[in-house]
């Protein structure tokens, strides 16, 4: 696992956007051989999306031959609901780049048969071989997508009951009313994530410090979903200074020295 320790949230957004655009350009995608990108929602990736849009506007990256799969979606929200992830992605990213809308894939939280929808999503991912690069964030309790603590590390895309802590944290998007936050969501599984060729996780803020410590210094266990990343051969975590507060000084020094050339990538 690689850790890229940066200073600010803006640095994480800039670094990750540049890394993603470089990965796409290096792959040289075509219609017959698209670059497959896994995407999250939320405040942390929002800044990365803004940077990617800026790179697109400068002509430094194209999404014409990129296929995307989002991590998760609430159950029961209409696509145009202000807090649906469908609306988030179209409003904050897809509508501002040259991606083909038919190449964007999101779980349908309104499907009549939710389990069948999850199976369909898994099959769709497999139809492209694998996801080339999966971007993700992490919750304060270490969850990735909606894989809450105690999720199976071999799990696949499925219906998931949201933990109270997650619903409470997300209530800020629902007028601070936890009763408006859906109790169920569709999410890719940990096993689904680990099948990606490469994973890039964005971690920012002091409230994510325990999760980062678990990911880097902890043992693999199902109560901290983020620790599953230790099992992946090509994971990168880009983080800001605030999120490193729980790391040992020697750990942070080790990665800072090891990645000094890549930190200079900014």
Swiss-Prot record:
GO terms for biological process: carbohydrate metabolic process; glucosamine catabolic process; N-acetylglucosamine catabolic process; N-acetylneuraminate catabolic process. The active site is at 72 (proton acceptor), 141 (for ring-opening step), 143 (proton acceptor), 148 (for ring-opening step). Keywords: Allosteric enzyme, Carbohydrate metabolism, Hydrolase. CDD domains: GlcN6P_deaminase (cd01399). GO terms for molecular function: glucosamine-6-phosphate deaminase activity; identical protein binding. The record marks 151, 158, 160-161, 254 as: Part of the allosteric site. The keyword Hydrolase applies. Allosterically activated by N-acetylglucosamine 6-phosphate (GlcNAc6P). Signal peptide: none annotated. It catalyses: alpha-D-glucosamine 6-phosphate + H2O = beta-D-fructose 6-phosphate + NH4(+). Pathway: Amino-sugar metabolism; N-acetylneuraminate degradation; D-fructose 6-phosphate from N-acetylneuraminate: step 5/5. GO terms for cellular component: cytoplasm. Its EC number is 3.5.99.6. The keyword Signal does not apply. Gene3D superfamilies: 3.40.50.1360. Homohexamer. Catalyzes the reversible isomerization-deamination of glucosamine 6-phosphate (GlcN6P) to form fructose 6-phosphate (Fru6P) and ammonium ion. Belongs to the glucosamine/galactosamine-6-phosphate isomerase family. NagB subfamily. This is Glucosamine-6-phosphate deaminase. It comes from Psychromonas ingrahamii (strain DSM 17664 / CCUG 51855 / 37). The lineage of its organism: Bacteria, Pseudomonadati, Pseudomonadota, Gammaproteobacteria, Alteromonadales. The gene is nagB.
């Amino acid at each position: 696992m690689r850790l890229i320790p940066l200073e600010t949230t803006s640095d994480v957004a800039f670094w990750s956007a540049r890394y993603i655009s470089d990965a796409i350009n290096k792959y040289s995608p075509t219609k017959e051989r698209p670059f497959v990108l896994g995407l999250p929602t939320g405040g942390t990736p929002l800044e990365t999306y803004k940077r990617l849009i800026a790179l697109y506007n400068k002509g430094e990256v194209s999404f014409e031959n990129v296929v995307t799969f989002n991590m998760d979606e609430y159950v029961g929200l209409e696509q145009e609901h202000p807090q649906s992830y469908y609306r988030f992605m179209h409003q904050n990213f897809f509508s501002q780049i040259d991606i083909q809308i038919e190449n964007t894939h999101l779980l349908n939280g309104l499907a009549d048969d939710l389990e069948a929808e999850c199976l369909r999503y898994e099959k769709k991912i497999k139809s492209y071989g694998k996801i080339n690069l999966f971007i993700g964030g992490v919750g304060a309790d270490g969850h990735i997508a909606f894989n809450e603590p105690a999720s199976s590390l071999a799990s696949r895309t499925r219906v998931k009951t949201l933990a109270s802590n997650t619903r409470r944290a997300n209530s800020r998007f629902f007028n601070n009313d936890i009763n408006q936050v859906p109790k169920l969501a569709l999410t890719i599984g940990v096993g689904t994530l680990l099948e990606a060729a490469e994973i890039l996780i964005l971690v920012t803020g002091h409230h994510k410090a325990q999760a980062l410590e678990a990911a880097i210094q902890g043992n693999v266990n199902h109560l901290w979903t983020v620790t599953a990343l230790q099992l992946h051969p090509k994971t990168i975590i880009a983080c800001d200074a605030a999120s490193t507060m729980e790391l040992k000084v020697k750990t942070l020094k080790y990665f800072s020295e090891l990645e000094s050339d890549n930190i200079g990538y900014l």
